[in-house]
């Protein structure tokens, strides 16, 4: 049991949490304007509102212009504060329920985008980690089990996005493995025409290969959680490449999930790396200056020796 507990709560530097806070809270602002951007419009048509399960469970009120406008400005202010790593718990506990409500309203037309799973969970677990107390939060190398638990939750949700997608593909086909051999990508390209996708329509075998690679990758995605070092990096790059291909073929980006892949990245090394580079550059500059002074001294000594010889 202790090994299981240790896996769920690895000791991770607080600096990774600080970087993740800054990036994700700023991304939420982008998300509100680029992806789930019609929440405020839903407040103008309350009669068309169809609450999702969580909204019904918590008996959230029907959105109005006043509610969605308040949500908007509260989220903007709280995200900007949280991104600075000042008052991360207070600001974080404001952002988590506010953005969850924002998403519930925005997706109330029935299209629930599963690419927001990891992002929403990340916003709920980040406030559980205390504020850094040692200098710059982005450089704090203090290792914390609380930080490890938050990071692990985000990682699990990132992977669950793919694995549960594979399960959904099986379930929709009556638990038969027919999805990889279907014409789903062909249908998607026809529905979302794009030059790269249209070129692939002339090579259907490539589409079937891509479907097989995709579903196998989704089923094997949990393996990434146990990989280490470069192997984990390769696993992450595989899925990021998967999204790059989807964007090129279908213009489907999945950015809310992609940005959460940063939970796997050792971002706590960023500041020490820059500091070591700066120190190395300073040492090189000092060495160059010393060499220049030594050359000047040698030139001066040579000139004096010539003058003495001439005398």
Model-flagged regions — what are they?
Residues 1-311:
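Alpha-helical membrane-anchoring segments
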